[in-house]
């Protein structure tokens, strides 16, 4: 987008975004990466993983971001979130909710 967007802390100096910002597919795709991938997303409360060693696959904003993650509750009752993709082969690691101490790639073993 070549048009300059004036974002000013003083609302009196700010301007309305150009119509192209709301209609251009390239701007939308760029916004998904620049805005939505860098912010927090609510994916559930801790009641779904009360048991220890539980692994729950979640897709963040399906059909929009399609970011696969794993919610994991360790045996020490510590809830964490990890990418659900093997960084080497791009393989999905956890396909359904399960109880396991380890996350194991089906490709690597």
Feature annotation, model-predicted:
Residues 80, 102-104:
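General beta-strand recognition
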């Amino acid at each position: 987008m070549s048009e300059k967007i004036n974002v000013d802390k003083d609302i009196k100096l700010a301007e309305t975004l150009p119509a192209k910002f709301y209609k251009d597919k390239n701007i939308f795709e760029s916004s998904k990466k620049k805005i939505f991938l860098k912010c927090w997303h609510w994916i559930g409360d801790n009641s779904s993983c009360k048991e220890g060693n539980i692994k729950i696959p979640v897709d963040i904003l399906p059909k929009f971001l399609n970011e696969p993650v794993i919610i994991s509750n360790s045996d020490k009752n510590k809830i964490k979130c990890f990418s659900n993709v093997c960084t080497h082969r791009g393989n999905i690691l956890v396909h359904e909710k399960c109880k396991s101490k380890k996350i194991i790639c089906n490709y690597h073993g």
